[in-house]
Amino acid sequence: MRITIILVAPARAENIGAAARAMKTMGFSDLRIVDSQAHLEPATRWVAHGSGDIIDNIKVFPTLAESLHDVDFTVATTARSRAKYHYYATPVELVPLLEEKSSWMSHAALVFGREDSGLTNEELALADVLTGVPMVADYPSLNLGQAVMVYCYQLATLIQQPAKSDATADQHQLQALRERAMTLLTTLAVADDIKLVDWLQQRLGLLEQRDTAMLHRLLHDIEKNITK
């Protein structure tokens, strides 16, 4: 499975360099940056010693949404208190979740927020699943480079697995299901129920391939009967 690392508005060049070095160490190579030019500072390469190829191939996007244009499944890092109605997974819990997704999706992204404020609510809404590192200390904080290393270490086995032959045909099922569900909620005049919409959108990301296909069939039957 291809896994892209996305850094949203990183402020410090050293943090980008540390993230690139962590990626290189664990076999990751695709780094994207949103709304920042800090990687152009010399300090990025000083810290990213031996990881110049990752720095050279960084792709920059103005918004997180644009950076996810070719991604099938998005995981965003945040504190548990920000999760609201989202499913919240530890790094360990992400492994079986993404292993299942790799059988019918080819490209996932792991998103890290700003050093001082993390991701906005609008950015978190773009994620299929939220994740965070459980901390014991009273001041639960990892710097950006440390956080990237934790996740790259945990997920390294996934990028070593060959792509499934049937992934291309099914990888857009989840996005299509989201759009179909929202259309149905609009038809039922409940699309303005924020709690319901948030709950539904985040739980859809947990569905396995068979469940996704079955829900498509259910929505099809509901749509057909509504229009009678």
Curated annotation (Swiss-Prot):
Family to which the UniProt record says this protein belongs: Belongs to the class IV-like SAM-binding methyltransferase superfamily. RNA methyltransferase TrmH family.
Q: Which residues form the signal peptide?
A: none
NCBIfam families annotated for this entry? PRK10433.1, rRNA_methyl_1
Any single Gene Ontology cellular-component annotation: cytosol
**What EC number(s) is this enzyme filed under?**
2.1.1.-
- Keyword field contains Isomerase: no
Q: What is the lineage of its organism?
A: Bacteria, Pseudomonadati, Pseudomonadota, Gammaproteobacteria, Enterobacterales
Q: Which Pfam families match?
A: SpoU_methylase
Instruction: Write down the InterPro entries for this protein, in alphabetical order.
Output: Alpha/beta_knot_MTases, RNA_MeTrfase_TrmJ/LasT, SpoU_MeTrfase, tRNA_m1G_MTases_N
GO molecular function terms noted in the UniProt entry: protein homodimerization activity; RNA binding; RNA methyltransferase activity
Binding-site residues for S-adenosyl-L-methionine, renumbered to this chain: 77-79, 113, 133, 140-142
Q: Which GO terms describe its biological process?
A: tRNA nucleoside ribose methylation
Q: Which UniProt keywords apply?
A: Methyltransferase, S-adenosyl-L-methionine, Transferase
Judged by the first EC level, this protein's enzyme class is: transferase
Q: What is this protein called?
A: Uncharacterized tRNA/rRNA methyltransferase LasT
